[in-house]
């Protein structure tokens, strides 16, 4: 089992409705009614108020066309990220089935994999063909590294307890605020399945079986994850900067204020800490506390992070 290697092939082709397999997949997953991407107004899916742009001077000074472009791109980024997360779930489930310690675990992970395939079929029609070939962002790279390199006993904690738990909050926010009724219903349905995935992680995780190396691997992963959260909404910031044609550092800080970087990032970090703080893993959380991993970086530091990767 130790020789099993699974690759999270995020850029693998995905033909969707153009595939000869589509009717079978759609029939099994219920993904029968397809939205027309040409008719879908991405800028209306989540509002400027939801993002915080309604209080952003930089956004207010853009033309209506550019404001809509910002909203459309930001909203598309939510759907594209969800697409690749669910796609990653296929690789995760495959690895966990192949390395399961018993038939019960193999059954569970096969069922989780079926859920991920279903979610992927639901989201895929809302994502353009080009976007499906372009996995972007540090989080997707981080998730792929976990799935490909980390042992199954740690993945139960890092993926199912922490990332799936994080996903419950994220999908709940998307479902409650989405202005597209079918898409809102879709995210609400995904939320129910993800809750089961998260709970099963709590059942399976046994920290008493962890070695010192396991704890070191967990600490390294959690440091990376918390850092990605600490720097705030870098993706949305990049979209505003690109549409506006390049912003000054003070304008970038203004956008981060509107995006509620300090308050919302702090809320997310506290949630992350709560999910991490499982029995016998509390020492790792204490170490991260000592390293200030659950505090947002300042506005200036968040802007510096963005500018350095421009």
Locations of regions flagged by a protein language model:
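Non-heme di-metal
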Residues: 1-310
């Amino acid at each position: 089992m130790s020789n099993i290697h699974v690759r999270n092939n995020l850029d693998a082709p995905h033909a969707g409705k153009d595939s000869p397999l589509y009717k079978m997949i759609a029939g099994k997953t219920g993904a029968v009614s397809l939205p027309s991407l040409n008719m879908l107004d991405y800028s209306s899916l989540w509002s400027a108020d939801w993002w915080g742009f309604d209080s952003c001077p930089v956004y207010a000074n853009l033309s209506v066309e550019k404001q809509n472009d910002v909203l459309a791109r930001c909203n598309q980024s939510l759907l594209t990220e969800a697409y690749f997360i669910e796609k990653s779930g296929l690789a995760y489930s495959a690895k966990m089935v192949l390395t399961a310690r018993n038939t019960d675990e193999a059954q569970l992970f096969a069922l989780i994999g079926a859920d991920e395939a279903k979610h992927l079929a639901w989201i895929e029609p809302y994502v353009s063909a080009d976007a499906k070939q372009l996995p972007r962002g540090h989080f997707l790279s981080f998730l792929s590294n976990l799935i490909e390199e980390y042992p199954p006993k740690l993945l139960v904690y890092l993926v199912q307890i922490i990332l799936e738990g994080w996903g419950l909050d994220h999908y709940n926010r998307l479902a409650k605020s989405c202005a597209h009724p079918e898409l809102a219903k879709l995210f609400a349905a995904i939320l129910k399945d993800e809750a089961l995935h998260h709970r099963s992680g709590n059942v399976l995780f046994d920290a008493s079986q962890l070695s010192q190396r396991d704890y070191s691997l967990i600490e390294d992963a959690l440091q990376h994850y918390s850092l990605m959260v600490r720097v705030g909404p870098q993706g949305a910031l990049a979209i505003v900067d690109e549409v506006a044609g390049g912003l000054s550092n003070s304008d970038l800080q203004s956008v981060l204020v509107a995006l509620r970087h300090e308050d919302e990032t702090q809320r997310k970090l506290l949630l992350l800490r709560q999910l991490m703080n499982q029995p016998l893993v509390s020492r790792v959380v204490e170490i991260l506390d000592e390293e200030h991993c659950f505090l947002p970086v300042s506005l200036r530091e968040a802007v510096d992070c963005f500018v350095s990767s421009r």
